[in-house]
Amino acid sequence: MAYAPQLRLYNTLTRMKEEFSPLDADNVRMYVCGPTVYDFAHIGNARPVIVFDVLFRLLRHVYGAEHVTYARNITDVDDKINARAARDYPDLAFNEAIRRVTESTNAQFQADVTALGNLQPSVQPRATEHMDEMRAMIDRLVKLGVAYVAEDHVLFSPSAMNERKGPRYGALARRSLDEMLAGARVDVASYKRDEMDFVLWKPSKEGEPGWSSPAGIAVLGRPGWHIECSAMSMAKLLEPFGGGLKCDDPLKNQFDIHGGGIDLVFPHHENEIAQSCCAFGTERMANIWMHNGFLQVEGQKMSKSLGNFITIRDVLNEGLPQLGVWDDVDARDRWIGLAARLSMLQTHYREPINWTAQRLAESADELHRWYGLLRDRKFTVPETLTAVGEVVEALSDDLNSWTAITALRKAFKARDITGLGEGMALLGLLDPHFVMAEDIPVFAKAEVDHQAIEARIAERLRFINEKNWAEADRIRDELLQEGVQLKDGKDPATGERTTSWDVVG
């Protein structure tokens, strides 16, 4: 276990920043809600992937990679998938059409989030692989009296849950049943005992995918969205460590961290807690619940109707048009992906984020400067990160990525390549290919002496501070004649004047 300051994380459940103490330091466990694979992931979907990848890296650094399990699910059973399959493959058998939609969409998602610099989670369970666990949990909930069968559906009753000892329904959202009912889009159905009851299982219509049903229901059916995550987290984070439905030890039926976007607090995460806590008789499903904030695009809510709906693939294909065409398309995707990652990490994960083309371009410029220094000094990635103290300290304070990036800027300014490179690695911003390879277009436009250019830029900044504009302009013009274009700006952290440069022509 590496030394680190006490990790403190904001817990949505308690609305407090809490010291993180894993249930078992040898088996730290985290679950994050993943994609429903029916369409390309949009740029808002990228945010939780990046946020919890940084947390995954931090936990691995502190507790050891072999002691951390990160599960991110794949939802491959959903009405939206069915609709997309019917639209895109009308001539195929329905199950084959669904398979094509889910396989191709998942493959695209994996490629896109990898380009953003993310590690693969430890496990990525698919809903279709865990029907047995879902049926078993539903049977348990019916037996306990918090779920019931009606017209071949199985429904969970929040009011029945609140009549039992244990956690209250609504504790995560901090709302009463009446408040949740008033603010929710509730499916009205005659077979419900109460409007707030939600579906655990529903019958499949003819031609739709279906599986053997729980609770003695004779017709084929499929699960509701919420039970899928309860079952998959049980399968990957409880059962392998001695927990599950056969275990009556409450501590073995909890895990450490559950994450996702703020939009999932209600109803999805509220319903997960209800199902899991009732099934296992626990006070908590996960000890800490973390949620990232919303994303806007150029100051507006992202929406297809506004014409500002941007997928991750759109960003990778078109986000930095000034890069031109690269022979190595995969490397180009990764370069833009790292710029997108840096852009997102400049906003604290719990705050709303404003995605802009300008910030993406500025992040790419900053990466260019950082990698330029690492390339000049022949930085090599060590097996163990030992010079990441300031970055770890920042991230240990509720993933304060802005302060962590400020530490990287400080290391760059001091020409501390070890602190810069290792800190970039911990944040997922370091791709060794861009340090070592000779044929990277953004670095291979011309052979230039980086140190000499930086020295002349420093001299120019001195002239600017002295208000000697003629000499400052002379250096700028000389560099441009040599194929080096300067771009003036301000350090986002300090407000100091900065100058970046690029090789042109």
From Swiss-Prot:
One of its GO terms (biological process) is cysteinyl-tRNA aminoacylation. Its EC number is 6.1.1.16. Binds 1 zinc ion per subunit. It comes from the Bacteria. Its cofactor is Zn(2+). Its main location: cytoplasm. Pfam families: tRNA-synt_1e. GO terms for cellular component: cytosol. CDD domains: CysRS_core. A motif ('HIGH' region) lies at residues 35-45. It is found in: Cytoplasm. It catalyses: tRNA(Cys) + L-cysteine + ATP = L-cysteinyl-tRNA(Cys) + AMP + diphosphate. Keywords: Aminoacyl-tRNA synthetase, ATP-binding, Cytoplasm, Ligase, Metal-binding, Nucleotide-binding, Protein biosynthesis, Zinc. GO terms for molecular function: ATP binding; cysteine-tRNA ligase activity; zinc ion binding. SUPFAM superfamilies: Anticodon-binding domain of a subclass of class I aminoacyl-tRNA synthetases, Nucleotidylyl transferase. HAMAP family: Cys_tRNA_synth. Belongs to the class-I aminoacyl-tRNA synthetase family. Monomer. This is Cysteine--tRNA ligase.
